[in-house]
């Protein structure tokens, strides 16, 4: 992991390079990078993949109902748009409930703008995200 990027190595064999955005979501970038350093995401699947919308991962149980043992994060909503390749934090109905789950947008999803914390943008390897199995 470089200081301004992180690389997800997918079990399907592809690498996804994400440019981090600490300028818009410093707390969330710190959370993601600390979990990466701990190996939290190693072997974690994308448990929710909706074609034309997004792929969601970050739950160690693979069910979509769990996160890390760390406290939830305060929202860092911004004007950054949800476009193809945007990396954003998943959450429950509470704005301040993001923890470890995140999603990558397949296409523009402007209806999420200012409601979910954007923390990165895929720089390369989006074709591997596109190839994730639906589920």
PLM regions with names:
Residues 1-135:
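Cyclophilin-like peptidyl-prolyl cis-trans isomerases
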């Amino acid at each position: 992991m470089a200081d301004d990027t992180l690389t997800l190595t997918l079990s399907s064999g592809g690498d996804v390079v994400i440019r981090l955005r600490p300028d818009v979501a410093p707390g969330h970038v710190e959370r993601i990078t600390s979990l990466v350093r701990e190996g939290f995401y190693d072997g974690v699947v994308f448990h929710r993949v909706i074609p034309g919308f997004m792929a969601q991962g970050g739950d160690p149980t693979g069910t979509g109902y769990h996160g890390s043992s760390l406290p939830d994060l305060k929202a860092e909503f911004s004007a950054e748009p949800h476009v193809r390749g945007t990396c954003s934090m998943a959450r429950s109905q509470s704005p301040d409930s993001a923890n470890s789950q995140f999603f990558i947008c397949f296409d523009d999803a402007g209806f999420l703008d200012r409601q979910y914390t954007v923390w990165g943008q895929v720089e390369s390897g989006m074709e591997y995200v596109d190839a994730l199995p639906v589920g």
